[in-house]
């Protein structure tokens, strides 16, 4: 249990929905910063594949518990919930990064390849949570094949 009174939480966040949205917002900012730092010295043409190295390291970390967005959104039925808005923003961020990276890599169809890499990422995270980090390594192998054409 948190050492905080419910009234204090509502005073700070306004509602339970805003508390959940604030949690996801923090998680997305942290993830973006981690990814950007990890890829900073990688040429844009190699970032899509290098991203999967980051995924493998994350899945192998002792703190790995899967994707906070997937966990949280799976519990929300309201499409307008503020946490869903945060989650959709993060998904759009990933999609745009993959489009940038696949374009820089010179693949034949960067948009379709970017969508496929998002699916691989989703599977890597969900699979690693259930089966262990080998699933992230499998996704990296598949990403390499996909990017090679």
Regions found by a protein language model. Give the residues of each.
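Amphipathic, non-transmembrane alpha-helical scaffold segments
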Residues: 24, 28, 84-92
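An amphipathic alpha-helix signature
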Residues: 32, 49, 92-99, 140, ...
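Hydrophobic alpha-helical connector segments
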Residues: 22, 33-65, 114-117
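Amphipathic alpha-helical segments used for helix-helix packing
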Residues: 61-82
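Helix-turn-helix
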Residues: 1-18
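Alpha-helical DNA-contacting segments of helix-turn-helix folds
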Residues: 13, 20-27
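Hydrophobic/aromatic-rich alpha-helical bundle segments in the mid-to-C-terminal region
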Residues: 82-89, 103-147
């Amino acid at each position: 249990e948190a050492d905080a009174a419910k009234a204090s939480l509502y005073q700070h966040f306004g509602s339970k929905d805003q508390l959940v949205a604030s949690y996801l917002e923090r998680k997305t900012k942290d993830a973006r910063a981690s990814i950007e730092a990890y890829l900073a010295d990688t040429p844009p043409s190699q970032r899509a594949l290098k991203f999967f190295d980051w995924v493998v390291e994350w899945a192998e970390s002792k703190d790995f518990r899967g994707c906070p967005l997937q966990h949280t959104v799976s519990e929300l039925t309201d499409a307008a919930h503020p946490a869903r808005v945060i989650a959709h923003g993060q998904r759009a961020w990933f999609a745009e990064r993959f489009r940038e990276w696949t374009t820089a890599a010179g693949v034949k169809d960067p948009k379709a390849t970017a969508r496929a890499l998002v699916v691989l990422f989703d599977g890597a995270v969900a699979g690693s949570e259930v089966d262990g980090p080998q699933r992230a390594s499998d996704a990296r192998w598949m990403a390499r094949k996909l990017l090679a054409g």
